[in-house]
Amino acid sequence: MIRTEHPTTDTLDLAAIRARHTLLLLDLLWNGDLARVDIARELGLSRSAISSIVTELISVGLVQEVGTRGSGGVGRRATLLNLNTRAAALLAIDLGASHARVDVLDLHCQSLSSLTVPHDIVSGPQATYTLLGTLSAQAMRAAGIQSAQVALVGIGVPGPVDHDTGRVVQPPNMPGWDGENIREALQNRLNLEVLVDNDANLGALAEARFGAHRGTQDLIYVKAATGIGAGVLLGGRLHRGARGGAGEIGHISINEQGPVGRSGNPGSLESYAAAQVLVTLARARRAAGAPSQLPEPVTLEGLLAHANTDPLARAVWEEAGHHLGVAISTTLNLFNPQAVVIGGRLSQAGEVLLGAVRASAHARTMRINVDRARIDLGTLGVDAGVRGAGAMMLDSLFTPRGLPHLYGIARMAQNTRSVGEASASRAPPAGPSPPRPAERATHPRPVPFLTEEHHEKSTAARRRPRRHHQRLRRWQTGDLLLVVR
């Protein structure tokens, strides 16, 4: 996501202009293959300016030529350009209260390898870092990459975290982690640059970029699992708060006379609807004689599997949905989002939970804040954490500050491939020749890493009539072209 100041006529920084044009070009290619002439038309730049940038991107390995397109019978066939999604790798880590997952992603946030193991967050930081180091090495080996090809590491954790420093801040569900600097510790362990955020924040990014609500600018993502938290996306940007504590919906009091939760707040949402609370409730009702066919002992897995078929399980999920809806109505009235997406393990209860959430939230929300707000289940499932970590890393890399680092990684990956190809060419053939590769497949692309604001500004040139530029001033300096009203 490009979040740079736009150059003006007063401060003409040619390097900044070129960097911005480069990022806009990469954004276009991130969404599909294009010819140079298409890019020039889309960005309102001269062909010479585009060719200069493309030549540079090809030289570092970020862009590649992938074939030609018919010219309609007139002129030469246009060469298509493609973003090389394997030019750099991303290491995405989803650290939950009871699991750890590490994925190696390409630049489209598609998984190249994935490892998930049970892990109790209560085991503490050092045991967790050791495990993550082992999983990271195994995941990179499985993906066939070296650490030098990894541009960034992104990790989501189940508690409040200061995104700028990577330090955990008063996490109710991470005992022994308060004040722990995850960013610094993992950088020392992996010898790679690390970004850290709350898991619910990353869920919000994932659903807005890759889920059913892709492109949505105002979205609340509620992750309901061992704990309950929310990621708040406003105007396409995460709202983290002053210290990273925004979105702690699980600690909103929905009943001042209710039980005290882990945060110490009476009647908090987590004390009514967190995973272990629901299991304890179901066991107590089963012991009191409530009719049920749930297998003994009652577990979260059993409650999820029989959400629609067992009367006790259904009642538990309907009550949980009611309580979630009470808290969600607060977020609707505060932020007036376009969508609320429910993810996390509890969302696997499906329509039983969702129906109760909608009924409860709608009954408590002003009409202006609910009429056009959709409340849905997440569509990314267990992949939301790693996909969100990937989006966070793209937002850091595809910026003027991150671009030089991405260039360096891409050059390294290109050199590594060249050495491997040279070695393979000298080796004697083994077995029959491989079949010819199939024609390059096309896949539906997620929304680009540019915000809506940047798209509006970057597409202004192509919306103007080409013959009637009103009051435009042009500076042509070398291979740079800046169009200003």
What are these regions (language model features)?
Residues L80-N82, L90-D94, V150-G154, L219-K223, ...:
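Short glycine-aspartate micro-motif
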Residues D106, H163, L233, W475:
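Short, acidic, Ser/Thr-enriched surface-loop or helix-capping motifs
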Residues S111-D218, V352-A363:
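Glycine-rich phosphate-binding loop and adjoining helix at the ATP-binding site
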Residues S111, V168, L238-H239, L480:
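Hydrophobic "anchor" residues
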Residues E456-R485:
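Ribosome large-subunit tunnel/peptidyl-transferase-proximal elements
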Residues M1-R69, G73-P118, V122-A148, E256-Q257, ...:
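ATP-binding/phosphotransfer module of carbohydrate and carboxylate kinases, centering on a glycine-rich
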Residues D199, A225, A389:
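Active-site glycine-centered loops adjacent to acidic/histidine catalytic or metal-binding residues
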Residues G215-A273:
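Glycine-rich phosphate-binding loop of actin/hexokinase-like ATP-binding domains
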